[in-house]
Amino acid sequence: FPTRRSSDLEFLYRLRFKSLSGWIGYAHSNFMREIDLNSDGVIWEERENYPAKYNKPQSFMAVFSYKLNNKYNLGMTCVYESGQTYTAVIGKVHQAGQQNFHSLEKPYDYFGNIYGKRNGSSYPNYIRVDLNVSRKSKLFGLPGAFKVQIINVMNYYNVLLYNWNHDASPSKVEAYSMFPRVITFGW
């Protein structure tokens, strides 16, 4: 069975002034996994001791709400996190067991990935700022609030995953983002 080690330091501060409320949080953490993959009773430091997938050493979040008057509220959320860990592809190799050679048109058909150290790389840092405005109102006699929100105001490209294309020579990597700037509204 795998064992896990973690160390963590967290800070949370709640704000409460006249019209401004919210909180600020910071966490510094380290999560490691240790597993005997080949069941030989020996842990190989370079392959069987690695950062957990959810290891994000730095995490900062701030949430603010400002009450303009009895009807209108402004809100802001700021997030900064270290990038999530992943196992990087460091090369490609022909998988001779499947077929010796496919064709001259597609010579890279039976290539597979050569992986680096398990969870030894990190995606770029995750940065996001959201803004919102809400107005108290009634809809069909029911109390509520109409809200407009801009998610990812800075339109920062937060990488969700990498996709490796071995059909190209040299191999190409393409990054996929979570979402661009999005404007939402609702009641």
Residue ranges and their predicted role:
Residues 16-18, 53-56, 67, 71, ...:
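Context-gated lysine
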Residues 55-59, 68, 116, 128-131, ...:
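Short amphipathic alpha-helical surface micro-motifs
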Residues 79-109, 123-130, 134-187:
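C-terminal beta-signal and adjacent terminal beta-strands/loops
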Residues 110-115:
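Short glycine/proline-rich turn/loop motifs
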